Every structure is written in structure tokens, then in C-alpha cells.
């Protein structure tokens, strides 16, 4: 993809038939052919543009992989919530059969499972937010690459890349980088994150209490 079909020559001009001018099958027809001889300046500019296009392709691949990873994590939290609901039903049924402490265990069970389920939902919301953030970044990079390819084709249609054309292409990449820094900036620890950490600690304490109550009453049966 991109300009990978170009191979920069080591001399100031490129002889006819050089691999620098050939395109691989996947990119055939994507860009206009360059003339048999190009200047050092055009050669340098093509090399720089080639690196930028490659960088965008790697960014798209990276963002898509992160998007899929957060999607898998989101599926896991869905499974956890389902398991907790089933545990709520089972433990609630067992608790009612324990004389004396059934209501205590039942109340603790519903409270604990509800809290854990709430944490799972909050985590899922955060995962979804990160998933969509990386999806948007992938879309922006894909759009930038398409724009870059369009400008490249137009620039080399006359066999050279002028200073103005090169600057225009570079500005496209710079604008994308600046946007990436703004979108990708990590915020400081928010109130929501602090509350989530607090709830996770409470959930662990609640789980330990439930385990102790179950062990104590099962030993009396």
C-alpha cells in the first residue's frame, strides 16, 4: 500500500528502467508513473512522503488492533455480569434455607452482587469509550491517508513534486499529528475513576464477608 512500491535511488538522477519507477501489483495504477529521470529534490521529497504514508498505514493497523482488544474486554465484562446475576439467584436461594442468618446472607448477597454488577457496567462503559476513541482515530488516519494518496497522485502527475505540492502534503500530515495529540491526550485521574477504584475496594471487602458467612453457616449444617 501507499508508496512502498518506490525504492529511492542512491544517485542524483534515476536511469530508465529503475525499480524506483515500478509499482507492485497491489499498487499498479494507483499513482502515475514517474519519468525516467528525476532530480535529487524530487527524490528526497518522495522518500519523505513514502515514510509518512507508511506511518499512517501503521497507525491504522495499530488503532484497529486496539479497537478489537477493547471489544474483547467488553465481551468479558458482559460475561461477568451474567455470572453475577446467576450467582445472585443461587446464593439467594441457599440463604433462605439457612435458619437464623438467611435474611442477613440474602441481604448481603443482593447488596454485594448489585455493587459488583455496577462496577462491571462502569468498567464496560469505560472500555466502550476507549474502543470508540480508537475507532475514531483509525477513521481519521484512514481519511488522512486517502487524502495523502490523492495529493500524491496529483503532485507526481507532471513527473515532479514542487515545493508548494510538498508543503501541502506535509501540512496534511502535520494537521493529523496535531489532532492526534489532542484526541489522544490522557486526562488526570477523574472523580469517576476515583469512585470506581473505591467501589472495587468495597466489592472485594463485601465478597470476603460473604465468603466468611457461607463458610460459617455451611459448617453448622
From Swiss-Prot:
Sequence segments annotated as region (Disordered): 1-22
Skewed-composition ranges (Polar residues): 7-16
Family: Belongs to the IIV-6 259R family.
Protein name as annotated: Uncharacterized protein 071L
Taxonomic source organism: Invertebrate iridescent virus 3 (IIV-3)
Amino acid at each position: 500500500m501507499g508508496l512502498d512500491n518506490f525504492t529511492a535511488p542512491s544517485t542524483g538522477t534515476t536511469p530508465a528502467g529503475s525499480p524506483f519507477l515500478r509499482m507492485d501489483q497491489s499498487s499498479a495504477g494507483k499513482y502515475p508513473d514517474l519519468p525516467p529521470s528525476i532530480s535529487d529534490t524530487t527524490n528526497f521529497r518522495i522518500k519523505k512522503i513514502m515514510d509518512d504514508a507508511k506511518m499512517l498505514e501503521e497507525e491504522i493497523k495499530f488503532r484497529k488492533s486496539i479497537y478489537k482488544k477493547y471489544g474483547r474486554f467488553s465481551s468479558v465484562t458482559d460475561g461477568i455480569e451474567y455470572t453475577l446475576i446467576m450467582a445472585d439467584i443461587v446464593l439467594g436461594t441457599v440463604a433462605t434455607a439457612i435458619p437464623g442468618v438467611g435474611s442477613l446472607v440474602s441481604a448481603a448477597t443482593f447488596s454485594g452482587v448489585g455493587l459488583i454488577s455496577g462496577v462491571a457496567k462502569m468498567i464496560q462503559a469505560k472500555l466502550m469509550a476507549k474502543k470508540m476513541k480508537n475507532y475514531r482515530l483509525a477513521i481519521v488516519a484512514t481519511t488522512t491517508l486517502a487524502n495523502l494518496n490523492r495529493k500524491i497522485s496529483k503532485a507526481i502527475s507532471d513527473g515532479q513534486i514542487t515545493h508548494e505540492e510538498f508543503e501541502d502534503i506535509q501540512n496534511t500530515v502535520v494537521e493529523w499529528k496535531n489532532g492526534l495529540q489532542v484526541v489522544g491526550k490522557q486526562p488526570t485521574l477523574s472523580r469517576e475513576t476515583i469512585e470506581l477504584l473505591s467501589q472495587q475496594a468495597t466489592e472485594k471487602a463485601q465478597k470476603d464477608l460473604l465468603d466468611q458467612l457461607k463458610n460459617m453457616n455451611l459448617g453448622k449444617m
